[in-house]
Amino acid sequence: MGIHGLAKLIADVAPAAIKEHDIKSYFGRKVAVDASMCIYQFLIAVRQDGNMLQNEDGETTSHLMGMFYRTIRMIEHGIKPVYVFDGKPPQMKSGELAKRSERRAEAEKLLEAAEEAGEVENIEKFNKRLVKVTKQHNEECKKLLTLMGVPYVDAPCEAEATCAALVKAGKVYAAATEDMDALTFGTPVLLRHLTASEAKKLPIQEFHLNRVMQDMGVSHEQFVDLCILLGSDYCETIRGIGPKRAIDLIRQHKSIEEIVDNIDLKKYPIPENWLHKEARQLFLEPEVVDTESTELKWIEPDEEGLVAFMCAEKQFSEDRIRNGAKKLAKNRQGSTQGRLDDFFKVTGSISSTKRKEVESKGSAKKKAKTAGTPAGKFKRGK
């Protein structure tokens, strides 16, 4: 689920923290991608006649097709992806997982009724609700990535937390996931829609955590408490406190404990056995990989290995797989060139007030020298 309503709240309260870019803007960038989120997207979206793709043996192949072609697309644009797979879910997530099981059981009943009534649209809708990423899906995608020469990381716990840790350690530029809790886990940069279908034509949304906190007027600990109030996978929320009220209360009282001491508990009852402290600890000190010992290597694809796995075993078209392997090999060279801004380090900065003063003085001098001729326009590279 991530954090309920966080993206909209940021758009409303801290819109300057969100930038929109085309995929071409990420040439030379290393990005940690939430693998489970991607695989789930592929199982939902990569379909034929409303059903997941299958080979002649009845094995699902939607995840492999999605992983193969979306990864090639990123590499063709000079992006170096590293996929991060979920480990064991934290104990605190058991309540959320139980709710998901209940929703699946309900969807199964509704699917059965839709099939009996011959309701095609509802059959497709409820089939999608039953989609679940399995261990086999994960293992097959890991095998595929290895053959493609793309690194992956097995997170000890939540993938988003390890993605965030890799960004904080400087191993990658950003965490790519649809789950907003990557920000709560502390990723400095979050990318949404990076692995979305090209047909959707969605711009990539880039969220900057420091700007979010600056414009909201909160510290990271206060931001975590705000996310807990909005609703996460790890504990319940206080009923009646929506996003607007939550941020107002955090700004006023600074922590959940202070909020609880100052609100009308009859109007806003606290959940029984509320685990907000444990949720806070999980966000602030999650179980993640040792980033220092984590080596990320992008190597040449194994074309023959890809053909053996994807064609002989999974029954994909050999021409298409070989063509994809050649694209990987060709574009791997391009993505190793890196970005210009990797070679230049900013040694200092000036405040926005000072910058405006400098710019206004500079423009005044320029006008005097050029006798008011229009200045040329330029775009500063990123």
UniProtKB/Swiss-Prot annotation:
DNA binds at residues 47, 70, 158, 231, 233. Mg(2+) 1 binds at residues 34, 86, 158, 160. Its cofactor is Mg(2+). GO terms for cellular component: mitochondrion; nucleolus; nucleoplasm. Residues 336-344 are annotated as: Interaction with PCNA. Mg(2+) 2 binds at residues 179, 181, 233. Phosphorylated. Phosphorylation upon DNA damage induces relocalization to the nuclear plasma. Residues 352-382 are annotated as: Disordered. Residues 122-253 are annotated as: I-domain. Its EC number is 3.1.-.-. One of its GO terms (biological process) is DNA replication, removal of RNA primer. It comes from the Eukaryota. Residues 1-104 are annotated as: N-domain. Keywords: DNA damage, DNA repair, DNA replication, Endonuclease, Exonuclease, Hydrolase, Magnesium, Metal-binding, Mitochondrion, Nuclease, Nucleus, Phosphoprotein. It is found in: Nucleus, Nucleolus; Nucleus, Nucleoplasm; Mitochondrion. CDD domains: H3TH_FEN1-Euk, PIN_FEN1. GO terms for molecular function: 5'-3' exonuclease activity; 5'-flap endonuclease activity; DNA binding; magnesium ion binding. Binds 2 magnesium ions per subunit. They probably participate in the reaction catalyzed by the enzyme. May bind an additional third magnesium ion after substrate binding. Coiled coil: none annotated. Interacts with PCNA. Three molecules of fen1 bind to one PCNA trimer with each molecule binding to one PCNA monomer. PCNA stimulates the nuclease activity without altering cleavage specificity. PANTHER family: FLAP ENDONUCLEASE 1 (PTHR11081:SF73), FLAP ENDONUCLEASE FAMILY MEMBER (PTHR11081). Belongs to the XPG/RAD2 endonuclease family. FEN1 subfamily. This is Flap endonuclease 1.
